């Protein structure tokens, strides 16, 4: 199908998003075309603003518009615990259950030899630097319960064991092969309660 160039460009842009194929991209493009101009401009501004103003916290790696992020700044949080997650979306999922009150460390990925991602490609060095703080007593490994997440948890467990810090892994109330961001609060809560030392 031949579309006018601006629509083709918009369809191509939507297709760059994960899970958006040509049909969905075309549907979205035509929806945008039918929207009021001020709504489209507001949408475009939101896209630009998120790219310009959202960055990663220099301490934990979570998404933020301030530095440090609101979690790292919060003096009421338990500074003896760090929960290690793969992505910022996992921090949001953990925070929704309102039961964990410690700090976080976002790895921004997981070890995946098949994809050429090794320990040096994710934020492990930054985690080790944070663990030099002697107030840390427990590291909770909350990587996804899939092959990459398990490999990352095992690697971190072996790497951190000599530090003497208690290393725990969230329990598997989560489906194997699933992602933390899709788990409901009850499942996440049970998984956190049932974490075990590695």
UniProtKB/Swiss-Prot annotation:
InterPro entries the record matches: DNA_Rcmb_RecR (IPR000093), Rcmb_RecR (IPR023627), Rcmb_RecR_Znf (IPR015967), TOPRIM_dom (IPR006171), TOPRIM_RecR (IPR034137)
Organism domain of life: Bacteria
Residue spans, zinc finger C4-type: 57-72
Gene3D superfamilies the UniProt entry points to: 3.30.60.80, 3.40.1360.10, 6.10.250.240, RecR Domain 1
This protein's UniProt keywords: DNA damage, DNA recombination, DNA repair, Metal-binding, Zinc, Zinc-finger
Domain Toprim, first and last residues per copy: 80-175
GO annotation terms (biological process): DNA recombination; DNA repair
GO molecular-function term, one example from the UniProt record: DNA binding
Record Pfam families: RecR_C (PF21175), RecR_HhH (PF21176), RecR_ZnF (PF02132), Toprim_4 (PF13662)
Similarity-based family: Belongs to the RecR family.
Protein's job: May play a role in DNA repair. It seems to be involved in an RecBC-independent recombinational process of DNA repair. It may act with RecF and RecO.
Protein name per UniProt: Recombination protein RecR
